[in-house]
Regions:
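A short alpha-helix capping/helix-coil boundary motif
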Residues: 110-113, 155-159
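Gly/Pro-rich turn-and-neighbor structural signature
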Residues: 158, 167-173, 179-191
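Conserved short loop/turn motifs at secondary-structure junctions
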Residues: 161-163
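Active-site-proximal, well-structured secondary-structure segments within enzyme catalytic domains
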Residues: 145-158
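ATP/Mg2+-dependent ligation/transfer catalytic cores
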Residues: 1-148, 166-173, 187
């Protein structure tokens, strides 16, 4: 996460390339560590008035050549194709899935999938997933739904997007929003 201020909400074309030290992110060695962030998608930041979230590709110092870690640059973009993603994940707190007892495991699966009630979904999980849904919608992400999954502490959200790169950008931005949101709850995410 990096923050840059503008006088007004920028367009994608107004966003500059942004250099960074690739050795800090293990994307370059110290003797030749320059890397560049190239903005490729912009979303309104629902957590900040007049804020923007910017998805970037990592480029070599020339700003044109994709960095070896830049898998997005390899995507053949089909702007007319529709893609749907189901992102499953666990909430983790204190080294174990949220809702798991300190010793052992919760009751066998069954009541958790699309479950309701404190004993099935806990006290904070639903609050987080619903707030995440609202954040995604406010950011313009085509978030299609949420549900509790088969294990305690396990959830899923669905993203449906048109265009190969646009759909991929939306799932990455939705993941980012979820991780940023869970910081305030002291909870980690394990995606699978």
């Amino acid at each position: 996460t990096q923050i840059k201020e503008f006088d007004a909400f920028p367009t994608l074309e107004q966003l500059p390339l942004w250099g960074f030290d690739g050795s800090s992110t293990q994307q370059a060695e110290g003797r030749s560590s320059d890397c560049v962030l190239k903005p490729v998608a912009i979303y309104p930041d629902p957590a900040r008035t007049n804020g923007a979230l910017v998805m970037c590709e990592v480029m070599m110092p020339d700003g044109v050549t994709p960095h070896a870690s830049n898998a997005r640059a390899t995507i053949l973009d089909d702007e007319d194709a529709w893609f749907g993603f189901e992102q499953e994940y666990f909430f983790y707190q204190n080294g174990r899935p949220l809702g798991f007892p300190e010793q052992g495991y919760p009751a066998p699966q069954g009541p958790y999938y699309t479950g309701v009630g404190y004993s099935n979904v806990g006290d904070v999980a639903r609050e987080i997933v619903e707030e995440h849904l609202d954040l995604c919608l406010a950011a313009g992400i085509n978030h299609e739904g949420i549900n509790a999954e088969v294990a305690k502490g396990q959830w899923e959200f669905q993203i449906f997007g048109k265009g190969s790169k646009k759909a991929a950008d939306q799932i990455w931005m939705a993941r980012y929003l979820l991780q940023r949101l869970t910081e305030k709850y002291g909870i980690d995410i394990e995606y699978h």
